[in-house]
Amino acid sequence: MFPHLKGHGQRVNLQLLQEAACRELLQQLDRIEGSKVIVLDETMIGPLDLVTRPKLFADRGIRLLALKPELHLPREVANVVYVMRPRVALMEQLAAHVKAGGRAAAGRQYHILFAPRRSCLCVSQLEVSGVLGSFGNIEELAWNYLPLDVDLVSMEMPNAFRDVSVDGDTSSLYQAAVGLVQLQRLYGRIPKIYGKGEFAHRVWEHAKQLGRDERTLYNGDKGVVDQLILLDRSIDLLSPLATQLTYEGLIDEFYGIRQNKLTLPAENFPSDGALPGGGGSGPRVEESQSLLGDTEKKTILLHSGEQLYAELRNKHFNEVTKLLARKAREIHVQMHATSQDKSVQEIKSFVENLLPQLMAQKKATSEHTAIAGLLHEQVNAVRFADDLAAEQEFMVCADIDKPSAYIEDLIACRVELNRVLRLICMQCHAASGFKEKLLNHYKRELVHVYGLEVLLTISNLEKSGLLHLQTESRAYSVLRKTLHLTVDDNVEIEPKDISYVHSFYAPLTARIVEHSLKPLGWQTLKSQINNLPGPTFEDFQAQLVGIGGRHTVTTVSEGSLLNVPRVVLVCFVGGCTFAEIAALRFLAAQEDNNVEFLIATTKVVNKHSFLDSLMSS
């Protein structure tokens, strides 16, 4: 169903995770007899697409609908199955929908599948609303980590960092721990665990306790994953705020990639001609219309199963335009090669076999050229260049202890608040906090222009650690030098260092992982990252020597074990960016490292979505 998840030579087969999630859903549906429709909370539409295809429901005669106030259900349907996030705020809408449906069709049965777990608060709210008796089954789908790509899984919880740091809701930490146990159930016990940060430590403590409860499932079974690195988002708040300069990162920042899908106005793309044959590797338009879709929009799938995108995604944007131009020339040469010296049989073979592939490659190149063109307009805008210059000055600690003239100009011009706050937070992080006088100066300026309500947002930023008073440690300034977070002579095309993802800044999280790969790396690293917030921890799980992982792709002899890359699971608690992911993929591509990464995150974020989650009420 999702062949791109298996990968080529990957030791961790994420198809197993997808199949387990799909199987769990079907088992729940099969327990419900009679005709049925599935009504989805809007935040569950994307996750559902990650584990199954619409055809699977069509084959079973099940319709998919989005939960909206104006939704009317078919009268003949006997069962309505709601698939929802366990959010109390949704229960009022759900109760109203059930009451309206009950009046329209007597005898109809309702069911709820909460993902990733059942909520007692939600059930209590349904009871208060007087509709609890209408529900036959109230179950849960243990969808913790969902596979986005061959090396990437996500909990799809965009507010996880805010929930924990601002609201004090630690349920996402528990779910991350449950997800780690689930991964070990599928792929075997992870023997070595390293981590940094308070929330990361709490995730591991939960996972360890849950693992003890499930000891019989994988006791002593050394799995395919050799090492786990847990990183708390709060140890590096600069990277999620920084402008990403990889192709994938820029797409996400300007247009948003949601569950591997990019949706843009169809007018931006060349019309789709009929392609001979069925082969090719171009970006595939999703077969089914999105439940929230717009017929004037075009949706393109972006994952490693699309060959051209896999080649472009982690490149610096300056390299992408050159690669696309070269690819277009190559296709043109192949398609217009002279046929004078070819036999009829050779021409027939070309038309039947090679031509469909070339047409698909041409379509993919054309579409990505259109996307790159849209990005080029954004990147060449004056505001983009000015903002980038300002944040890069902060990254090298230039004039970080006094008010920024650029930020003050933005405030005076009353630009959008997010844009101003992002730069203020970046300056604060680079300075390891503001002196009280400087922090109060910015607060006064913001209140004067944006009103008193801005203080509520500032309070959230202070609770989350994005704004705070200066500490004596000067952690960022020290780490910038000891871990080489900024590289002056960085190369963007065919780079030699991970700093290319931000042109000259290496994400701290990725640099920590890079150093941990070295012999005695974590032991050496501990003293360097000691000034970062939260504990530095390590743990080891008992294993039986010589027992292979239960889901390795290939079986290797003892003599060849040294040539097999070690598998490192890097888990971001609080979200990570595509730039950080690109940096880890760059490290995995270096032969000297002999490593394969599996990346887990609560959500893939960018500078806009990360800050927005903290600003919402």
From Swiss-Prot:
Keywords: Autophagy, Endosome, Lysosome, Membrane, Protein transport, Transport. SUPFAM superfamilies: Sec1/munc18-like (SM) proteins. GO terms for biological process: autophagosome maturation; cellular response to starvation; compound eye pigmentation; crinophagy; determination of adult lifespan; endocytosis; endosomal transport; endosome organization. The keyword Hydrolase does not apply. Gene3D superfamilies: 1.25.40.850, 3.40.50.1910, 3.40.50.2060. Residues 268-287 are annotated as: Disordered. Signal peptide: none annotated. GO terms for cellular component: CORVET complex; cytosol; early endosome; HOPS complex; late endosome membrane; lysosomal membrane; lysosome; membrane. It comes from the Eukaryota. It is a peripheral membrane protein. InterPro entries: Sec-1-like_dom1 (IPR043154), Sec1-like (IPR001619), Sec1-like_dom2 (IPR027482), Sec1-like_sf (IPR036045), VPS33_dom3b (IPR043155). It is found in: Early endosome; Late endosome membrane; Lysosome membrane. Changing L26V: In car-1; irregular clustering of early endosomes. GO terms for molecular function: SNARE binding; syntaxin binding. Changing G249V: In car-1; irregular clustering of early endosomes. Disruption phenotype: Flies display impaired deposition of pigment granules. Member of the 'granule group' of eye color genes as mutants affect deposition in pigment granules of two types of pigments, the ommochromes and drosopterins. RNAi-mediated knockdown results in late endosome fragmentation. RNAi-mediated knockdown causes impaired autophagosome clearance in fat body cells of starved or wandering 3rd instar (L3) larvae. Core component of the class C core vacuole/endosome tethering (CORVET) and the homotypic fusion and vacuole protein sorting (HOPS) tethering complexes involved in endo-lysosomal vesicle trafficking and lysosome biogenesis. The CORVET complex facilitates docking and fusion of endosomal vesicles during endosome maturation, acts upstream of HOPS, but is not involved in autophagic flux. The CORVET complex may cooperate with the early endosomal tether Rbsn-5 to mediate endosomal fusion. Component of the class C core vacuole/endosome tethering (CORVET) complex composed of at least Vps8, dor/Vps18, car/Vps33A and Vps16A; unlike in other species, Vps11 is not part of the Drosophila complex. Due to the reduced number of components the Drosophila CORVET complex is often referred to as the miniCORVET complex. Interacts with ema. Component of the homotypic fusion and vacuole protein sorting (HOPS) complex, composed of Vps16A, car/Vps33A, dor/Vps18, Vps39, Vps11 and lt/Vps41. Belongs to the STXBP/unc-18/SEC1 family. The name 'carnation' was given due to the eye color phenotype caused by hypomorphic mutations in the car gene. This is Vacuolar protein sorting-associated protein 33A. It comes from Drosophila melanogaster.
